[in-house]
Amino acid sequence: MRFAGGGFLKSDPGSLLDVIAEAEADLGGRPALLHYLAIPPTAFARTTEAIKDHGLAEGSKAVYEKPYGTSTASFQDLDELVHSVFDEEQVYRIDHFLGKEATQNLHLVRFANRLFGDAWSAEHLAQVQIDVPETLDIDDRAEFYDETGAALDMLVTHLFQVAAEVAMEPPLSMSAEDLQAAREAVISAFRPLDPAEVVLGQYRTYRQTEGIADDSKTDTYVAARLWIDTDRWRGVPFVLRTGKKLAASAQRVSLIFRPAEGPLHSTGAHRNVLVFDLHGNGAIEIDMTVKQPGPEPLPAEGTTRLNLENIAEGAMPPYTSLLYDVLTGNRSLFTSSAGLAAAFRAFAPLQGDQRPEVQIYEDDSWGPEAADALTDQLGWHLH
């Protein structure tokens, strides 16, 4: 391992070229180059240009952290520049949520188990909730976060990608190309967000953070209702929520079923809920109705949980898994230019004149109460 200091600019590459030359001498040839741009997004363009100007683009791969653009226009400008330096096959736009083993379980459990897959549609499901609350504050990320906010940092990236994992049609195969195509086809069916169905919030002590203006309007919370215009999902709301300084930390996908029909319909039987816990090694929970103990045939709610720790041996951390995929050329968990463009089209209404006002919420609460209305009468499964 070598360290190349001194910065990296078009005008001055620092010591990077010397370090690469040393590696070439040791290896007896040019090493494979992987440029991992885990840098502020404002530095993407100039760093990409520097890679080109110093002759480091040909035959290499480039990994870009989120956010890859901050709007449709800035995404298009950045992508045009990137494609002037790299071919699309060289570019990997990383989203570590897709690298989580538990996230990848969404499509595998669905397609491999008829028990779940046959019920995965509007015929059986009333609502899908994707919930990623955090108890943490913004810590030492004041400058980045105040320029970005929760919606841009999390909604158009992680939550949209998880929604696509849930909603995609069965791919032609489990190859990288077919998985990526299936996920991005459903992103193109995301209806542009309706600002009237979006709630933005800011935790009360946010403006007391060093580096944050007293009048900051940055959102630290977002909840949104997303509609997907495909035959499978038409009429089923996907309700997405994430935020800082909330009452609990979790990463969950909850598939809420329609009420059962038949002789128990009027007895108060609870809805079935299938929950994918994406945290850590992951788990699957099923809420179901069972008989309440006693002489009468009364319903009671029970939950069964399948922890996946017993099959987690050998699991790699998300970034390790994704960087391995980059090195081996597996693009199944990365977003193409077209897929990200579709995500920004769906997100665009939140960046216009109708963007909702930011509502203040108490630290360690569940966020603005107005977000409860997005779930209709079902309420948040995580509360």
Q: What is each stretch, according to the model?
A:
Residues 2-64, 68-383:
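Secretory/organelle targeting and membrane-embedding segments
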